[in-house]
Curated annotation (Swiss-Prot):
Cofactor needs: Mg(2+)
InterPro entries: Cyt_trans-like, PPAT, Rossmann-like_a/b/a_fold
UniProt GO molecular function: ATP binding; pantetheine-phosphate adenylyltransferase activity
Keywords (A to Z) from UniProt: ATP-binding, Coenzyme A biosynthesis, Cytoplasm, Magnesium, Nucleotide-binding, Nucleotidyltransferase, Transferase
Quaternary assembly: Homohexamer.
EC number assigned by the record: 2.7.7.3
Catalytic activity, reaction form: (R)-4'-phosphopantetheine + ATP + H(+) = 3'-dephospho-CoA + diphosphate
Pfam families with a match to the protein in the record: CTP_transf_like (PF01467)
The protein's name in its UniProt record: Phosphopantetheine adenylyltransferase
GO cellular component term, pick one: cytoplasm
Broad class of the protein's primary localization: cytoplasm
Family: Belongs to the bacterial CoaD family.
Protein species of origin: Synechococcus sp. (strain CC9311)
């Protein structure tokens, strides 16, 4: 079975990576789909995020890294995914993700959304929190894969 895991991943966190690993274990294949969102100003370019995820998942079998714009269900169909994988950190995530899942279902009833709760030790993580910590010189090695930690240091050092 193939799961689509969509997101902006700006940057990829260890919480994201944990979900990818667990998704591979449960479903066999995970397509990590990086959203090209023209409405956002990401810290990392699309190519950088694709490379970060590719490097961080190189130890896993069954991971494909791609990008998309537009509707998640169209990306899922294009990559022959049977389900959409999403992570939940808190109840606030659930309310938002449930709304998106219902929207996706209304667009194409073929796709189910599977929610996995985040591992407790990653429940505080978000890409926004990671960038904020890195911006002020805090350690992020326990929050992101090594390749991302190095890229964050370079990004914020060059911004000074």
């Amino acid at each position: 079975m193939r799961a689509l895991y969509p997101g902006s991943f700006d940057p990829l966190t260890l919480g994201h990576l944990d979900l990818i690993e667990r998704g591979c274990s449960l479903f066999g294949e995970v397509v990590v789909a990086v959203l090209q969102n023209p409405g956002k100003s990401p810290a990392f370019s699309l190519d950088q995020r694709l490379e970060q995820i590719t490097q961080a998942t190189s130890h896993l079998q069954g991971v494909t890294v791609t990008s998309f714009n537009g509707l998640t269900v169209n990306c899922a169909r294009e990559h022959h995914a049977q389900l959409i994988l999403r992570g939940l950190r808190a109840m606030s995530d659930f309310e938002y993700e449930l709304q998106i899942a219902h929207t996706n279902r209304s667009l194409d009833s073929e796709f189910e959304t599977i929610f996995l709760s985040t591992a407790a030790h990653y429940s505080f993580l978000s890409s926004s929190v990671v960038k904020e910590v890195a911006r002020f010189g805090g350690r992020v090695e326990h929050m992101v894969p090594a390749v991302v930690a190095e890229d964050l240091k370079r990004f914020f050092n060059s911004a000074l």
